Curated annotation (Swiss-Prot):
Record family assignment: Belongs to the TolB family.
Subunit structure, as described in the record: The Tol-Pal system is composed of five core proteins: the inner membrane proteins TolA, TolQ and TolR, the periplasmic protein TolB and the outer membrane protein Pal. They form a network linking the inner and outer membranes and the peptidoglycan layer.
Protein name: Tol-Pal system protein TolB
Organism: Rickettsia felis (strain ATCC VR-1525 / URRWXCal2) (Rickettsia azadi)
Signal peptide coordinates: 1-19
Role according to the record: Part of the Tol-Pal system, which plays a role in outer membrane invagination during cell division and is important for maintaining outer membrane integrity.
Length: 444
């Protein structure tokens, strides 16, 4: 994960006076900014192929964000490429490109790739950003994601999220159904399976770093084991044999503890485990079902859902179990809360019932709802939408979406992403059905 090394080339100009202004990605919906990602120069035909692929990945990343509109290269007027010259800005303005990316790819004697780029503002005719990245040849895609991250951050003011991974549960579409833990890039590329499908697996979670995952596996129908898998070495070990567990643990920001729900004696409660000593500490009490705990980014609070008042609602407590407060008050059942990495919002699944039956909704609410009684906002709904998780910059939510079975057509489940605003919903393509997504932090 540490194979990409950065060398700052130039970050010469601030946004003061920048004609496009910083894009606000939280409020409302703005037209995407037109950007031209020019051909990356290369010294050889092999490097030229890599350069072509890098341009495709950068363009796709920016397009998927919904904030940029890559312009087709067929409309480019200027024929010069590379980073050694100053662009003919009038030619780019003529095709309505507000931003321009030029770059080059070179293979070093070490065998690594050196990939350079410059981001230009064609309206003010100024350079906005530029970097040189070195990466092993097989990590060219990650280098492209890093470049897109830098462009996204420069224009929006928020960190990018393109150089990330998604772990999820893959399920075969044919009988017998086989469930496996799978790993892929955030955009669906580089999909690979981490388990063999011989046992039921559920709720994969990333550890504090993206180098390890944890998941629940049922060796038998009544015996649930929590496994830890090292993604670098492939080594797997049992964290614990927790009778009654239904979801994998979620980890504290410092990586020392984890929270999980365990059913015992007719009730389900939240427990915290010290990962070093494996000692369990019960955080909730009374009767009822308390599930789906999630830490706040600072580790001081835990959000979870509980039916202690008859219908599942969301609650927040201190990480030691004290000062319990209910935070959801709308009609319906609330489940699967997930705290934004920014700390400002909590995503959730809400189930409502009407004349046509149940409707599933993905929503967000402020983490301190007492500051705004109308803080809840539904961002998407459907037959089955569940398991929301956040991008590392807290601006995009990924979730599982399902459709019912029809005559001669089985139901299906896929992974989708949607912006915090409720716009730009898009499917993340997977080779089979998919559910229970979990988003990593930005890779090192």
């Amino acid at each position: 994960m540490r194979n990409i090394i950065y060398f700052i080339l130039s970050l010469l100009f601030s946004f003061k006076g920048y004609a496009l202004e910083t894009i606000n990605i939280e409020h409302g919906r703005a037209d995407p900014t037109p950007i031209a990602v020019n051909k990356f120069n290369a010294d050889s035909s092999a490097d030229d192929v890599v350069g072509h692929d890098v341009v495709k990945v950068i363009s796709n990343d920016l397009k998927l964000s919904g904030l940029f509109r890559p312009i087709s290269s067929a409309s480019f007027i200027e024929e010069k490429t590379g980073i050694e010259y100053k662009p003919l800005f009038a030619a780019w303005r003529q095709i309505n490109a507000s931003l321009l990316v030029n770059g080059e790819v070179k293979k070093l004697e070490s065998g690594k790739l050196k990939i350079s780029f410059i981001l230009w503002d064609t309206l003010l005719e100024k350079q906005l950003a530029g970097e040189i990245l070195e990466a092993p040849e097989n990590l060219w895609r990650r280098a492209a994601h890093k470049i897109a991250d830098k462009i996204y951050e420069k224009i929006t003011g928020d960190a990018g999220y393109f150089d990330t991974k998604i772990v999820y549960v893959s399920e075969s579409t044919s009988l017998p159904k086989i469930k496996r833990i799978a790993l892929m890039d955030y955009d669906g590329a580089n999909n690979k399976y981490l388990t063999n499908g011989k046992s039921l697996v559920l709720t994969p979670r990333f550890a504090r770093s993206a180098d390890k995952i944890f998941y629940v596996s049922y060796a038998t129908k009544r015996r649930a084991l929590v496994y830890e898998k090292d993604l670098k070495t492939g080594k797997e070990s049992v964290v614990g044999d927790f009778s009654g567990i239904s979801f994998a643990p979620r980890f504290s920001p410092d990586g020392r503890k984890a929270v999980m729900s365990i059913a015992k004696n007719g009730s389900t409660h939240i427990y915290e485990i010290d990962l070093a000593t494996k000692r369990l500490h019960k955080l909730t009490d009374g009767f009822g079902i308390n599930t789906s705990p999630s830490y706040s980014p600072d580790g001081k609070k835990i959000v979870y859902n509980s039916d202690r008042n008859g219908v599942p609602q969301l609650y927040i407590m201190n990480s030691d179990g004290s000062d319990v407060q209910r935070i959801s008050f709308g009609g319906g059942s609330y489940t699967a809360p997930s705290w934004s990495p920014r700390g400002d919002y909590i995503a959730f699944t809400k189930i409502t019932r009407g004349a046509e039956g149940k409707t599933f909704n993905i929503g967000i609410m402020k983490a301190c709802p007492q500051d705004d009684e109308n803080s809840e906002r539904i961002i998407t709904s459907g037959y089955l939408v569940e398991s929301p998780c956040w991008s590392p910059n807290g601006r995009v939510i990924m979730f599982a979406k399902g459709w019912p079975s029809r005559a001669k057509a089985p139901g299906k489940n896929k992974i989708f992403a949607i912006d915090l605003t409720g716009h730009n919903e898009r499917e993340i393509i997977t080779p089979a059905d998919a559910s229970d997504p979990e988003w990593s932090g930005v890779l090192n």
